[in-house]
Amino acid sequence: MAQVPMINILEAALRHGYAVGAFNVHTHEAAAVIRIHEQLRAPAIIQLIQPSAGFMGGRADFMNATPEEMCCGISRFCRLVQPMMEQASVPVALNLDHGNDPETAKICVDNGFSAVMIDG
């Protein structure tokens, strides 16, 4: 099953009265999130927090990553998790959690995120 918009997962949960977990991952943890949700036959939300994008972009001081490092990190993260999501047997959404700025949110959307949250 391919990636789905997060709103689809949330609307179904609201309609049918269940909760959906959203898990902040950095790399291969995404595979574990998907695998357990497949066992439960439940939709999953995978999230990337903005500082992790800086770290994935090669910045040791990830809280001060440049826009270029953020873009690189988001792109790397997507190349890692999107194949996992495409092979999943359950709906999976990809969300930016605790975003700090519209520029990073746009980079995420351009790289295939189905939702972003700017609250940082």
What are these regions (language model features)?
Residues 25-60:
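N-terminal low-complexity or amphipathic/hydrophobic leaders
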Residues 20-25, 44-48, 92-98, 116-118:
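Hydrophobic faces of well-ordered beta-strands that scaffold small-molecule active sites
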Residues 64-90:
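Alpha-helix-loop-beta-strand connector modules within alpha/beta enzyme cores
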Residues 1-21, 32, 78, 82:
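N-terminal amphipathic alpha-helix/helix-capping segment at the start of soluble metabolic enzymes
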Residues 30-33, 100-112:
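Catalytic cores of alpha/beta
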Residues 3, 74, 100-104, 120:
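Active-site-adjacent beta->alpha loops and helix N-cap segments on the catalytic face
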Residues 18-19, 54-74, 113-120:
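Glycine-rich tight-turn/loop motif centered on a GG-T
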Residues 40-41, 110-115:
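Glycine-enriched alpha-helix->loop->beta-strand junction motifs that scaffold or abut catalytic
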